[in-house]
Amino acid sequence: LRNSLARFNPQAAERVLYLTHWDTRPGADNEVNPADQLRPIDGANDAASGVGLFVALADALQKKPSSLGVDLLFVDGEDYGDFGPPLVDVMLGSTYFAAHLPEPGYRPLFGVLFDMIGDADLRIPQEINSVQRAPEVVQRVWSKAAEMGRGDVFVPREGQAITDDHIPLLDAGLKVIDVIDLDYGPGNSYHHTLQDTMDKISARSLKIVGDVALALLR
């Protein structure tokens, strides 16, 4: 397992942390056929959408740097094991990062986890753990999206509580929220299945999320 951290403007004291997981599910456990459940998923949305977003953000930040320090963290092992309960071998990379921060006293102004943001029918509600534990970051992100006319995607209503890579960071005292659309496909029928493929991904959805993510850094 391996995390990767890309740091822009590394000397800046004021920093923003963006993270995404780059691993994909080793088995398609939501498939009906037991044989298919043993096959790894492509993870076009559940992993690769966040990675693609970060590649585009890195390119934009290289061309027009932010005055803020920006940390793009790719974490491994989010989807490796069993979400239970109990949790077994999941969120491994984010848990490691939370215990081994880049420097003593590392406290970014805010952090955002981007997960499953490539769905063609993208609707991102406010994840409950984020609302309860980092409401000021939720307000910052959703206000910026509304200001940009993207309230149709960043929906101003509470969703469900999701166990994801922001939890270990919240537990470590960092203010990190989860930007995620867990409703993937009709009746969530693509999540953790062999249907999580590139034909389900929308360039428009990725651009909307990317525009908001970049605007938060300006």
Cite the ranges covered by each PLM segment:
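A non-catalytic alpha/beta surface segment that caps or lines the substrate-entry region
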Residues: 1-11
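Envelope-exposed proteins and targeting segments
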Residues: 2, 14, 68-71
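Active-site-proximal beta-strand/loop segments in catalytic clefts of secreted hydrolases
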Residues: 8-10, 19-23, 57-58, 73-78, ...
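Short, conserved acidic/polar surface loops in the N-terminal third of protein domains
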Residues: 17, 28-31, 83-85
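Glycine/charged-rich beta-loop-alpha catalytic/anionic-binding loops adjacent to active sites
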Residues: 29-40
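Acidic/histidine-rich catalytic neighborhood of metal-dependent amide-processing enzymes
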Residues: 38-136, 144, 161
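Active-site-adjacent substrate-binding region
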Residues: 110, 117-218
